[in-house]
Amino acid sequence: MKQYLDLLRHVMETGSDRGDRTGTGTRSVFGYQMRFDLSEGFPVLTTKKLHLRSIIHELLWFLNGDTNIAYLKENGVSIWDEWADENGDLGPVYGAQWRSWPAPDGRHIDQIALLIEALKTNPNSRRHIVSAWNPALVDEMALPPCHCLFQFYVSDGKLSCQLYQRSADIFLGVPFNIASYALLTLMVAQVVGLKPGDFVHTLGDAHIYANHFEQAQLQMTRTPKALPTMRLNPDVKNLFGFKFEDFTLENYEADSSIKAPIAV
């Protein structure tokens, strides 16, 4: 995807070298936006192969409101292992905030269910927002939300999504985030009876870790291939009814994977 390679190049060429929480060091810019027209194909990287199984299972795990890595481990997904405690718990991370945001009066708010209902009954609303950033609980989370708020927008029978990501690990994390929220947009569009529109990805602190510079330079030498097509099982009409087997990625051709260490 040209949009992603442009981001890599922009940060490598114009970014500021800074320290960070992990002690690794980064090169970063503040504020960057990419736009993907989902009618042109599914935005998954072709300049390195991604582990799509991890992306799908993580999204289903979020939507289930789960915050323990047991489901992920059972399905061969290890991306959260570094942050879990000895029992596999992560604290009130994404799934808890999406599906069970605690209200002051003791209620728990299912933001995703409310979102789906609002998209069906009041599509022109400007309040189709889900937030994972709960200041009262951030300190209890194993990792505070990086992709922390998203909003849907309906126009001309199409559903678009914009994500705000406060902290963006460009080499390892952002490719997953693009594919994950593009997939979420396809899923939500199907269950509310709309066509997919755009996925807009807005980044706050957009950074490349110092120990990813060599890998980023390698990736920038590669030429993007045609985007694949993501097929969803058309019989699924409930967002919480999707299973891993309901997704098929067709015509995905990608260059070899590029290994890089994760900063914890």
UniProtKB/Swiss-Prot annotation:
DUMP binds at R21, R126, R127, R166, S167, A168, D169, N177, H207, I208, Y209. It comes from the Bacteria. GO terms for cellular component: cytosol. (6R)-5,10-methylene-5,6,7,8-tetrahydrofolate binds at H51, D169, A263. It catalyses: dUMP + (6R)-5,10-methylene-5,6,7,8-tetrahydrofolate = 7,8-dihydrofolate + dTMP. One of its GO terms (biological process) is dTTP biosynthetic process. Keywords: Cytoplasm, Methyltransferase, Nucleotide biosynthesis, Transferase. CDD domains: TS_Pyrimidine_HMase (cd00351). Pathway: Pyrimidine metabolism; dTTP biosynthesis. Pfam families: Thymidylat_synt. It is found in: Cytoplasm. Catalyzes the reductive methylation of 2'-deoxyuridine-5'-monophosphate (dUMP) to 2'-deoxythymidine-5'-monophosphate (dTMP) while utilizing 5,10-methylenetetrahydrofolate (mTHF) as the methyl donor and reductant in the reaction, yielding dihydrofolate (DHF) as a by-product. This enzymatic reaction provides an intracellular de novo source of dTMP, an essential precursor for DNA biosynthesis. Homodimer. Belongs to the thymidylate synthase family. Bacterial-type ThyA subfamily. This is Thymidylate synthase.
